[in-house]
A protein has these predicted regions:
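Soluble metallo-hydrolase cores and metallopeptidase-like ectodomains found primarily
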Residues: 52-54, 128-130, 141-174, 242-321, ...
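Metal-dependent peptidase/peptidase-like ectodomains
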Residues: 63, 101, 131, 153, ...
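Short helix-loop-beta-strand segments that form the rim/entrance of peptidase-like active sites
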Residues: 70, 336-362
Length: 442
């Protein structure tokens, strides 16, 4: 087994075991107060030699295990894309529940009603532009944004207006935008991503996917396109959810490949460009689904819950291996290794495979509602949904003193190249309701 690939499992399991075995009960509200007479020590007293030894055991076991990879393989190869409401999403719920029962977890399915949006025909072509060869058109590769409404059956044919950002759009008189297809031409900042700020780069670009269609509609646009968000090009469109504002008309919305967005922008600089656009997605009635909840009961504080999680649903244009099959599999691996090594967590470990993170977050919202009276007993919540490459460390949304208490674990994680601890304002979409309720998030 390639140990480099398994480091993500090792890092996640070490973090989980720290929270299970090391932090005091009140760690989420205050740091451990040192004795006034004690000598300074780089290791807080909450870490016993046995705890640190268990962390090392977990690290080695995780590096040598292929359990998580086998789970991802089944989710992607045997089930496939898992868009909320689909048959594949339902099969994934059954599979993950069965696997977690097999390793000895107490498993239940908690009902969630999820949006059921389905993709339809997606075609576009440039039918008129400066310098056009006679009797030709230019094919444009694109996909509908999640939740998009459809064009009329025969499509829309309109001039394309290219804008760089919201400010440029809002500065234009309405008559210049009305009746046009608006293309937000905002390239993903690959340099920022290369410097370790991929999340920030993604966030800067994704606002045009989330809010672009409504902003274009307010100005009279008949459809909205964005330059696909992300660093991978290869003429592949990148989908994601668009968030229609309640006070704006809903217009068809899509993502154009980076290469085709570049083409359109270049042609528009030379003269007017007209596009024929056909998108036929459909929103069906909400469908019944479930969050998968799997517990390893705590030996001393079973009422206190530590969540380790990933989201089981995925977009339909890929197999959902990275987003977020890997996150679900790593969470399952954490439980698997704790059971395999016969460790007895003090607090209840709750593995959650969330449903509907991608286009509604219905699963996390329903969990927060169903467990509202128990939120005060949620000791910590962890989510992995940031990719499946080599991990660099752990994000922390908690009391800053908690970061200091993590120093011994960071030292062990660094042996796998994943020892960076970073205080952040937000850790994950699915644990956000718990974050807002004051639960420490990782």
């Amino acid at each position: 087994m390639d140990q480099w690939r398994n480091r993500v499992c090792a890092s996640w399991v070490l973090l989980l075991s720290l929270l299970v075995s090391a932090l005091p009960v009140d760690a989420q509200h205050a740091a451990v107060e040192p004795s006034p007479t004690a000598s300074p020590s780089p290791t807080p007293a909450v870490f016993s030699p046995q705890t640190l030894a268990d962390l090392k055991r977990l690290q080695q076991e995780a590096l040598n295990s292929d359990y998580a990879y086998r789970q991802v393989s089944h989710l992607t190869n045997n089930i496939g894309p898992r868009l909320s409401g689909s048959a594949q999403a339902a099969k994934a719920v059954e599979y993950v529940a069965s696997e977690l029962k097999a390793i000895g977890c107490e498993v239940q399915l908690e009902k969630v009603m999820v949006p059921h949006w389905v993709r339809g025909e997606e075609t576009a072509a440039l039918v008129q532009f400066f310098g056009q060869a006679p009797n030709t058109t230019q094919k444009i590769v694109l996909c509908s944004l999640g939740g998009s409404v459809a064009t009329p059956k025969n499509g829309i044919e309109a001039e394309v207006l290219v804008v760089k950002n919201f400010d440029e759009l809002k500065s234009m008189p309405r008559e210049k935008v009305a009746g046009r297809i608006v293309l937000f031409y905002y390239p993903f900042d690959k340099q920022m991503a290369a410097q370790g700020q991929g999340g920030e780069a993604y966030g800067e670009a994704v606002v045009y996917r989330s809010h672009g269609p409504s902003e274009a509609a307010r100005q009279g646009g008949v459809a909205c396109l964005i330059r696909s968000v992300g660093g991978a090009d290869y003429r592949l469109p990148h989908t994601g959810l668009t968030d229609y504002a309640k006070d704006a008309p809903k217009i068809p919305a899509g993502a154009v490949t980076a290469e085709d967005a570049d083409l359109i922008a270049d042609l528009v600089r030379q003269g007017p460009v007209k596009m024929k656009l056909v998108l036929t997605p459909e929103t069906l009635p909400d469908a019944e689904s479930a969050n998968v909840i799997a517990d390893i009961k705590g030996s001393e504080h079973p009422e206190q819950v530590i969540i380790v999680s990933g989201h089981l649903d995925s977009w339909d244009l890929g197999t959902g291996a990275i987003d977020d099959g890997a996150g679900v599999a790593v969470s399952m691996e954490a439980a698997n290794l704790i059971q395999k090594l016969r460790l007895r967590p003090k607090r209840t470990i709750r593995v959650i495979a969330w449903m509907n993170e991608e286009n509604g977050e219905a699963g996390s919202k329903q969990y927060a509602k169903d467990h509202e009276k128990e939120i005060s007993n949620h000791f910590a919540a962890m989510e992995t949904d940031g990719g499946a490459g080599h991990p660099t460390g752990v994000n922390i949304k908690a009391n800053p003193e908690v970061k200091k208490n993590f120093a011994p674990v960071a030292a062990i994680l660094q042996e796998s190249g994943a020892g960076i601890l970073r205080l952040v304002e937000h850790c994950g979409a699915d644990i956000e309701p718990l974050e807002k309720a004051g639960v420490p998030a990782f």
